């Protein structure tokens, strides 16, 4: 079983597109897209991780 992860190395970005591809974070919040999720990961200093793809 491989851990689910996304590459957030190119973040944070000031603006996220309106693309809707939900991801569920380890904080049990649904993020609208990889961009929104990665910005939150950066803000959390890496403590936030990806729980799974799709809504929580």
From Swiss-Prot:
It comes from the Eukaryota. Keywords: Disulfide bond, Glycoprotein, Protease inhibitor, Repeat, Secreted, Serine protease inhibitor. PANTHER family: OVOMUCOID-LIKE-RELATED, SERINE PEPTIDASE INHIBITOR, KAZAL TYPE 2, TANDEM DUPLICATE 1-RELATED. GO terms for cellular component: extracellular region. Glycans are attached at residue 45. Disulfide bonds join 8-38, 16-35, 24-56. SMART domains: KAZAL. The keyword Secreted applies. Its main location: secreted. It is found in: Secreted. The record marks 18-19 as: Reactive bond 3. GO terms for molecular function: serine-type endopeptidase inhibitor activity. PROSITE patterns: KAZAL_1 (PS00282), KAZAL_2 (PS51465). Coiled coil: none annotated. Avian ovomucoid consists of three homologous, tandem Kazal family inhibitory domains. This is Ovomucoid.
